[in-house]
UniProtKB/Swiss-Prot annotation:
One family name in Pfam for this protein: CTP_transf_like
Reaction(s) catalysed by this chain's protein: nicotinate beta-D-ribonucleotide + ATP + H(+) = deamido-NAD(+) + diphosphate
Function: Catalyzes the reversible adenylation of nicotinate mononucleotide (NaMN) to nicotinic acid adenine dinucleotide (NaAD).
Pathway: Cofactor biosynthesis; NAD(+) biosynthesis; deamido-NAD(+) from nicotinate D-ribonucleotide: step 1/1
Lineage: Bacteria, Bacillati, Chloroflexota, Chloroflexia, Chloroflexales
Listed GO biological process terms: NAD biosynthetic process
The protein's Enzyme Commission number: 2.7.7.18
CDD domains: NMNAT
Record-annotated disulphide pairs: none
PANTHER family named in the record: NICOTINATE-NUCLEOTIDE ADENYLYLTRANSFERASE-RELATED (PTHR39321), PHOSPHOPANTETHEINE ADENYLYLTRANSFERASE (PTHR39321:SF3)
Similarity comment: Belongs to the NadD family.
Keywords: ATP-binding, NAD, Nucleotide-binding, Nucleotidyltransferase, Pyridine nucleotide biosynthesis, Transferase
Protein name, per record: Probable nicotinate-nucleotide adenylyltransferase
The organism's place on the tree of life at top rank: Bacteria
Species this chain originates from: Roseiflexus castenholzii (strain DSM 13941 / HLO8)
Length: 199
């Protein structure tokens, strides 16, 4: 894996959709990143209930969705680990692979939740935090500087694109027999149909 300015976008991606891809591209362009790693989680510690589709299906959908963007790279670094997908561990592993200029892309609501994350101070040592705000949504982060005094120097806030798409909604639409085309790439739609996912 080559070094350089690298964005990290993790998530369940259950399924991946244009909202995820648009955020990754927006951050890549604005911050002049060399690439963005899309990292499907095996199991997210702060999201009880787990994913609906298997790790293998979610990885395959992410690869299909990112196939036409040379700046996106899908990583199986969390899928291959048996333990929960702790961000601090993932960043440490990437650091050990020679990636020293990391930009962790999070929704601004997740930034507000950082004090609950495992080894959050180590996360801030290993990566810049890119907080992506939903247009029109205000989240107060002023309290975080008291709990995490190093955060303001590591935080980059940007406004995200206006795309109101959620994986939960896509799963519900599939279950109801409603279309999801134009909300996720056609290759992902075809994969979901071919594998009978979310029915």
């Amino acid at each position: 894996m080559t070094s350089g300015r690298t964005g990290i976008l993790g998530g369940s991606f259950d399924p991946i959709h244009y909202g995820h891809l648009a955020i990754a591209e927006e951050v890549r362009v604005l911050l002049r990143l060399n690439r963005v790693l899309i990292i499907p989680a095996r199991e997210q510690p702060l999201k009880p209930g787990g994913s609906v589709a298997s790790p293998a299906h979610r990885l395959a959908m992410a690869r299909l969705a990112c196939a036409d963007n040379p700046f996106f790279e899908v990583s199986r670094i969390e899928i291959d680990r048996p333990d929960p997908s702790y961000t601090s561990v993932t960043l440490q592993l990437l650091h050990e692979q020679g990636l020293n200029d990391l930009y962790l892309i999070l929704g601004i609501d997740s930034v507000a939740d950082l004090p609950r994350w495992r080894e959050v101070r180590r996360i801030l040592e290993l990566a810049h935090i890119v907080g992506v705000a939903r247009p029109g949504a205000a989240v107060d982060l002023s309290h975080l500087s008291q709990v995490l005094p190093q955060l303001p120097a590591r935080l980059i806030e940007i406004d995200g694109p206006r795309l109101d798409i959620s994986s939960t909604d896509l799963r519900q639409r599939v279950a109801q027999g409603r279309p999801i085309r134009y909300q996720t790439p056609d290759a992902v739609v075809a994969y979901i149909e071919a594998n009978g996912l979310y029915r």
